[in-house]
Swiss-Prot record:
Changing residue 91 to S: Unable to grow under denitrifying conditions. Normal growth under aerobic conditions. Residues 154-205 form the HTH bat-type domain. Coiled coil: none annotated. InterPro entries: DmsR-like_N, HTH_bacterioopsin, WH-like_DNA-bd_sf. Induction: Constitutively expressed regardless of cultivation under aerobic or anaerobic conditions. Increased expression under denitrifying conditions. Changing residue 83 to S: Unable to grow under denitrifying conditions. Normal growth under aerobic conditions. This is Transcriptional regulator NarO. The gene is narO. Keywords: Activator, DNA-binding, Plasmid, Transcription, Transcription regulation.
């Protein structure tokens, strides 16, 4: 059996896409993406409160105080998004969400080496790339590749942020707590929480993937 790797990546770069920009100002739900029939355009749809002021997106549906918006763009090197980069490696994006100006994407790579290549390319194209979850298929044989993580690589504050986020269900699907709620539990503001979490995840990602 192929030792596939299921990864979930957090990208905090504000330039990544229009949906991430919208999520800075309001709650964004139900993000979906599709490629046009000609293969040179993509459309992204997301749901947000109708009261939100969202520019540069077409309103396509409205119901019960919520509006579905659509953003369409052509594929160019200048406007290439993280989804296109990942799919360029032959890995469809399985899950996409936006929160607090960042996006979370999940995909399955054929093996750890392929996953590492995608992450390296993401990190070269965008700032604030960090690992949220990494699951590897159980191999048919008992042999495996163990990775030892030195907890001392993380500061005490970074460990506290990770542990609190985990305990409160921040990494669950669907989330049991959002960034604002976890930050409140830690008695810090949301931007500080995001900064500590991103730094901790980046250190773990570098260790696990050896990049």
């Amino acid at each position: 059996m192929n030792e596939g790797v299921h990864g979930e990546i957090h990208v905090a770069d504000p330039s990544i896409c229009r949906v991430s920009e919208a999520s800075k100002e309001t709650a964004v739900e139900s993000v979906s993406r599709s490629v046009g029939a000609t293969g040179d355009t993509a459309a992204v749809e997301f749901t947000a409160p109708s009261s939100a002021a969202i520019d540069d997106a077409d309103e396509i549906f409205h119901h019960e105080q919520k509006t579905i918006y659509r953003v369409t763009h052509s594929f160019t090197e200048e406007s290439r998004c993280a989804c296109e980069l990942i799919e360029g490696h032959g890995c469809p994006v399985r899950h996409l969400e936006a929160d607090c100006g960042a996006v979370v994407l999940s995909f399955v790579a054929a093996d750890l080496e392929s996953f590492r290549d995608i992450v390296v390319n993401l990190k070269s194209a965008f700032d604030g790339v960090s690992l949220r979850r990494l699951t590897q298929s159980e191999p048919d044989s008992a042999t495996g590749s163990l990775v030892f993580v030195d907890r001392d690589e993380l500061t005490a504050r970074q460990r506290e942020v990770l542990e609190t986020a985990h305990e409160m269900g921040y990494f669950e699907h669907p989330r049991e707590a959002n960034a604002t709620e976890v930050a409140a539990a830690l008695d810090i503001n949301r931007s500080t929480f995001t900064e500590h979490l991103s730094a901790a995840q980046s250190k773990l990602l570098d260790t696990i993937l050896d990049v």
